[in-house]
């Protein structure tokens, strides 16, 4: 006998769950990367993958169907103008989920969901953050050498 595996309910009523997933999908399409709980990220991935696949058709009917799901003109416009152009040749797998450390307040499993072709280089961002931190930390060797170098240049 066929058993249907239910989707995650996320502790919400049906209408609230649909609204939550619609909002998360809209924000992902606009910002290309969002941080949320792991369960919400996995459910959002299902919705966004179907939306992008539908958008690749490029028809007016597909645009109307996507707007009925998202209810945000900015997100639909971004999807059809920018995202489909960059993802056009990819057959599925448009999103990536990266697991993060648990949230401090309630230890919920956290994750980042992002569009694959829009991922920024995380190494460059972390290097810049380390340099900024070294400048702020008092007594660090980097901060002292920069301070000495800066004073002699004046």
UniProtKB/Swiss-Prot annotation:
One of its GO terms (cellular component) is cytosolic large ribosomal subunit. Keywords: Ribonucleoprotein, Ribosomal protein. GO terms for biological process: translation. Signal peptide: none annotated. It comes from the Bacteria. Residues 141-154 have a biased composition (Basic and acidic residues). One of its GO terms (molecular function) is structural constituent of ribosome. PROSITE patterns: RIBOSOMAL_L17. Residues 127-154 are annotated as: Disordered. Belongs to the bacterial ribosomal protein bL17 family. Part of the 50S ribosomal subunit. Contacts protein L32. NCBIfam families: L17. This is Large ribosomal subunit protein bL17. It comes from Chlorobaculum parvum (strain DSM 263 / NCIMB 8327).
């Amino acid at each position: 006998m066929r058993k249907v595996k239910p989707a995650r309910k996320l502790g919400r009523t049906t209408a609230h769950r649909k609204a939550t997933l619609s909002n998360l999908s809209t924000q992902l399409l606009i910002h290309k990367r969002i941080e949320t709980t792991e369960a919400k990220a996995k459910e959002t991935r299902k919705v966004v993958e179907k939306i992008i696949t539908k958008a690749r058709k490029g028809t007016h009917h597909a645009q109307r169907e996507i707007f009925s799901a998202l209810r945000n003109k900015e997100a639909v416009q971004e999807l059809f103008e920018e995202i489909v152009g960059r993802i056009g040749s990819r057959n599925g797998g448009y999103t990536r989920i990266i697991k993060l450390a648990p949230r401090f307040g309630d230890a919920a499993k956290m994750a980042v969901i992002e569009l694959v072709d829009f991922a920024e280089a995380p190494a460059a961002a972390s290097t810049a953050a380390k340099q900024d931190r070294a400048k702020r930390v008092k007594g660090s060797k980097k901060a002292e050498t920069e301070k000495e170098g800066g004073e002699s240049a004046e």
